[in-house]
Amino acid sequence: MRLCDHDIERWLDEKKLTITPRPPAKHINGATVDIRLGHEFRVFVGHKAPFIDLSAPKEEINHALDQIMSDKIVLKEKECFFLHPGELALAVTLESVTIPDDLVGWLDGRSSLARLGLMVHVTAHRIDPGWRGQIVLEFYNSGKLPLGLRPGMLIGALSFELLSGQAKRPYHQRQDAKYHNQKGAVASRIDKD
């Protein structure tokens, strides 16, 4: 069962679900909560590594990632990040989210942005029970023109689905939780698999 607007507000009021900063009522829709773009980005720089062998030993993967991933790019309030056609960039939500052990979250990009070619999450749109942190966005520009992105703009929406019970292995209790308490545009940690 997906939570509707008044259930989302009740869960926020009761602090079962937390979104910081708390969204104003105008950003809580029938079954979703609007989320905004944060200030941090990461991009892929140059091509010092000819490829990334995802089945290679962890050290090789980590070395390749170090060669191609930029440092954090932090924008000020009015600054604009330009995502060019065919480019992939990581960004982060302005909001930090804590999801209880009996709820799963889903991230969807905005239709208006998709119609301009912006993919907000390339594949990872599930937010596990027990998740805590900012949500990293995997932006891809599939359009024909560069897209200007500014901190604070509406970028997507979260919906929440009630599970049949408490998760036995929520994200915050997993030993292999690579992104728990995530802050900022964290790069891939595939080398931690």
Curated annotation (Swiss-Prot):
Keywords: Hydrolase, Nucleotide metabolism, Nucleotide-binding. The active site is at E138 (proton donor/acceptor). Pathway: Pyrimidine metabolism; dUMP biosynthesis; dUMP from dCTP (dUTP route): step 1/2. It catalyses: dCTP + H2O + H(+) = dUTP + NH4(+). It is an enzyme of class 3 (hydrolase). Catalyzes the deamination of dCTP to dUTP. This is dCTP deaminase. The lineage of its organism: Bacteria, Pseudomonadati, Pseudomonadota, Gammaproteobacteria, Enterobacterales.
